[in-house]
């Protein structure tokens, strides 16, 4: 029976990855940060099912506490480590560049150093990001493409990406980078543009919201389903030798296209409900990202299973159900409607 250690287990990717590993018979350990409120809502169903069997074990820890990370890894002695923890909002990284950079750089380095000192047989996955490329040219990006980060978040990811390669080359660690392009799901955070759109569709459809304000509608992204992408993470650590892989769909769509499909799914014209505001534009906008997953397909046997339209519809369906529950509470006088998305 294999053991996995996941940082960022309470996030979108943490949910899908831990679900996958638990279904494969793994014992899964995950880190959560101490706070005044418990934030495990995404994985509550997994906790209910697997924690009583001691197959899902959560630990309080902070990636910036290198001693704590070393002690935890040395105690667990996992077969695989997946580093998913990060301050992952690009726009927030401009507002909090120091915290974003510390988490993204020192966190990954603490884990790599713990593996080097504790057990070099542990396999390590680092969550790299397509934001590292910068989106300067409208071309398909692969593992050899030039990195040109445009945000503090992207810069921190470049550091972790290169450090993962340094430890692989210098200490013969099984350390891999998964360069994941944008991946979404019903579990996506509500401040990300895709989820902001689908949540608004559900609320507008049920009469709880009137307008949706967005930023750059022309920004193009290669959007895939998070469940497909976390399967690729696992596949990377099952190979005979470590390597880096781009995980993407190979097609790109604009924010406007996403909104159009989301609203049309419920029979609405998006142009009647969407407005733009400059305050939602990023200081150094990445306009275009498109990935080439040929290497992953050839060496891992991986390819995306979920189409763009299936992804949009899946997210809208989920948020329609969420809005329906919210409507019931509103009708019972337990909630007030929000006529526009919160800023």
What residues fall within each predicted segment?
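C-terminal substrate-binding subdomain of Rossmann-fold SDR/epimerase-dehydratase oxidoreductases
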Residues: 23, 30-31, 38, 61-64, ...
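N-terminal Rossmann-like NAD(P)+-binding domain of SDR-like oxidoreductases, especially those catalyzing
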Residues: 1-183, 237, 265, 306, ...
